Amino acid sequence: MKILRSLLVLALLLGAVGGLATTSAQDQVTITWWHIDTAESQAAVWQGLADEYMAAHPNVNIEITILENEAFKDRLVTVMQAGDPPDLFRSWGGGVLWQFAEAGLTRNIAPELEGEWKDSFSAKAALELYGKDGEYYGVPYTWGAVGIFYNKDLFEQAGLDPENPPTTWDEFLGAVQALKDAGITPIAIGQRDRWPGHFWWVYLAIRIGGEEAFLKAYNREGSFADEPFVQAGEYLQQLVALKPFAEGFLSLTYGDSQTQMVNQEAAMELMGQWAPGAYAGNNAELAAQLNLGWMPFPMIEGGAGNPDDVLGGGDGYAVGANAEDEAVDFLRFLTSVENQRMLANSALNTVPTVGAAEDAITDPIMQRILQARNEAPYFQLYYDQFLPPAVATAVLDAVDALFAEAASPEEAAEMIEEAAAAELE
């Protein structure tokens, strides 16, 4: 019953060709595949891989469904509640995927993954987020770090040195004020979708409390109402008080924030490694004109967190409970070294999860993100995917209230702790 309730909560949350296939040539197999890459250039990459696989496997038909991110999350919950998952579907791993697995809605691919396929992944921590207790339900195809993308030209207009971006929180706030003084919107954000804003609060909690604070709260040896999480809210509202966002940012979508960056209407965006690809998908011509830089989230002086700690994640595909062997084989094909190298230099602009493909990255920003991911002493998956759905929803609600200045830092932390106390064992 608890799992069914969690699935209902998800509606609010989600803020080389292998040799596994066993079906004979005369038996036709259909693979249903859901992804969220709606930009024509990005969708074409996935379609090309599907076409290549189907050409090599005439008995396989791959039906692709492309949905916008929020619509995908809503529709996925609906089909999961009906017990009819897609054969392959986009997943960020963590608690959301684990809930599906506990409800019997995913296929355990551990037997097929074991050996060469599993050993090929360099992003071991990422792979583990697609499994639990020895079982695996999918694999990641890209994995990186959330950081601040910034417009070097706008920095120069504000008198800031684009080659030496701020490294501390105080320096960052100073840069925000300098941009405002120059008549430039400092930060792009689409808070209507809520998940972009939670990156700010989680990163502040990481910088202030480090890994220890999170693990204590998660393992119920501490609380999400403890000081580091309250202080994260205080620092966030310190930023909000500077009014660094576009007017009406609470009602703007993630797509709107992409447009702000592409049109050079805002100087910075805290976002994952997919951002440059998203900018190109928004407007390829304008995106090509951007002079972008990337910086890690600033450190908090006196904070317990390591400045190299990373909030991040990426994208992968999970396997539905009723998927045929061919679906697993196709997933293996998607994460082959050859295709990982291709994806890194495609419109999807991925950060490979397979070690032998990492040298395919030539873009300096992506190289920095790969380095940050691989060298992070503590890597934390986004809270809205790692935590159980009810707790993740509480995080999104609480952080949204902080941005709206509708809750105090203490009240926001208590909102999260209340959900954690009810859901975490």
Task: Spell out what each predicted region is.
Residues 5, 20-103, 115-118, 162, ...:
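Conserved N-terminal structural module of periplasmic/extracytoplasmic solute-binding proteins
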Residues 30, 61, 156-157, 162, ...:
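Conserved C-terminal helix/tail region of periplasmic/extracytoplasmic solute-binding proteins
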Residues 51, 55-56, 82, 158, ...:
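Extracytoplasmic/periplasmic substrate-recognition and gating elements
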Residues 86-87, 117-155, 185-186, 304-310, ...:
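A structural signal for short loop-to-beta-strand junctions that line the ligand-binding cleft
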Residues 92-150, 173-174, 200, 228, ...:
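Hinge/lid segment of periplasmic solute-binding proteins
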Residues 107-124, 165, 191, 208-231, ...:
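Short, solvent-exposed loop/beta-turn-alpha elements that line the ligand-binding surface or hinge
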Residues 133, 137-141, 146, 171-221, ...:
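Extracytoplasmic/periplasmic solute-binding protein
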Residues 174-178, 218-250:
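Glycine-centered hinge/linker elements that transmit conformational signals in sensory
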